[in-house]
Amino acid sequence: MKKHNILIIGGYDPTGGAGVIADAKTAKILGVNPLTITTSIIPQNNRAVYDKMDIPKKIIEEQLEAIFEDFDVSVVKTGVLNKDAIDLILKYKRHYDFKIVCDPVLKSTTNYKFVDEDLLRRYIDLFNESYLITPNEEEFNTIINFIEKNNLWGNIDKNPYILITGIDDKLTTLKDKGIIETIKGKKIDKEVHGTGCVFSSAIASFLCKGEGLREAIKKGKDVVLASVIYATKTKYNYNSNPTYINKEKVIKNLSYALYLLKKIEFSLIPEVGSNIAESLLLPNSFKDVAALTGRIIKNKLGGFYIVGDVEFGASEHIAKIILTAKNYNPQIRACMNIRYEEDLIDALSEKFSISSFDRKLEPPNVSTMEWGTKYACEKFGGVPDIIYDKGGDGKEPMIRVLGVNTIEVVKKVVEIQKIYDHI
Ligand SMILES: Nc1ncnc2c1ncn2[C@@H]1O[C@H](COP(=O)(O)OP(=O)(O)OP(=O)(O)O)[C@@H](O)[C@H]1O
Ligand SMILES: Cc1ncc(CO)c(N)n1
């Protein structure tokens, strides 16, 4: 089977939030082999871009020669380029068959200008040879105005796709102007450095794996949304953290979490049994949440059985906790219920953040899990590690452990069991 090699050609951001490092991290998590060529060294962080040193044309060419001599490349994704780099990419495009995904990085989010009019004129030739161009709204307007002002439509004989990126993206083509499709997004209240790089390299990676354009954009959108939600906090802002949450990842996490649970003498099992669940990113319904179709139940030997399989849509009860918690922290995608013990809660307060709800305060005609989780999160001011209630009306008291995924949740349960065993 042909190896998926993507060639990333762009600038070097030492923080890895943008540029070839961000692109390579994105390609790697998507199962594509990232070959990278650096066109310029760009000292920067979330505060500013401090400088830009272009790599000599000879060294860029030697990097290209080294790669094409030894690898088959199906997609080339471009970031910050200079004139030499564009000249060379177009030269190699004449001799090798690869798709170009061009992310026209005209300036940084910290307003450092990467492209002057002379270089933008050369970019038009690269756009003409590209399969897809991914400008943000401002870059798109700059490009179209430049072509109009300089009457350059005659230099364009092909019709590349353009994805105008934003929270909602608009798919069009360079010549047809009309919007073919709008891809709706979800806004997270964060300014994250490098999202354009992650989004365009994710789309390029899915294309490299053989996905069609629309599927590549749709999956790329999930990648960049996760990369924003799990972004790395820096002193001045956030750096993109290339992350991809899909059904395969959720099932793998759950399987490994159950593997870890079986390694301990887990005894904090409630009468109704435990379940453990993990959701896709920003789940819309319990169908986006995977859990056990059965339960974790005590056996007569003091141990426990894990009954059932892991399936999406298997648990509405635990799913409601996750579906509610995500509104307070979109990173929280997992939960497991364990047995409540009176003196355990006090013992846990040193290591874990805890909140609770009281069933006696529950209003009529509500889902207890939705109301209780909302109540506990609002009282806590976010999503705590633990939400408990002391039961009532024939309902068993319960502890619910929450986390970013089921592996983290089980590691918390292992710690809780240790504390319980030593009370
Ligand atoms: N705060 C956010 N919440 C959700 N999605 C976001 C957010 N910021 C960026 N994105 C996603 O990242 C994609 C690219 O972001 P944007 O359009 O800002 O590119 P850009 O301006 O080129 O970014 P940069 O220059 O920082 O690399 C958007 O299409 C959007 O899906
Ligand atoms: C190296 C590099 N590539 C792309 C961007 C776009 O944000 C940046 N700031 N730095």
Please describe what each predicted stretch is.
Residues 2-8, 20-109, 242-243:
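Conserved N-terminal subdomain of the carbohydrate kinase-like
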Residues 54, 70, 215-284:
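Charged C-terminal helix
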Residues 24-26, 142, 189-213, 217:
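Short, small-residue alpha-helix embedded
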Residues 30-35, 180-182, 206-221:
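Phosphate-handling active-site elements
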Residues 342-423:
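C-terminal binding/interaction regions
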Residues 248-360:
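Extended, low-hydrophobicity segments enriched in charged/polar residues
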Residues 132, 139-140, 153-190, 229-234:
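Conserved phosphate-donor
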Residues 75-150, 164-171:
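Conserved beta-alpha-beta core of the PfkB/ribokinase-like small-molecule kinase fold
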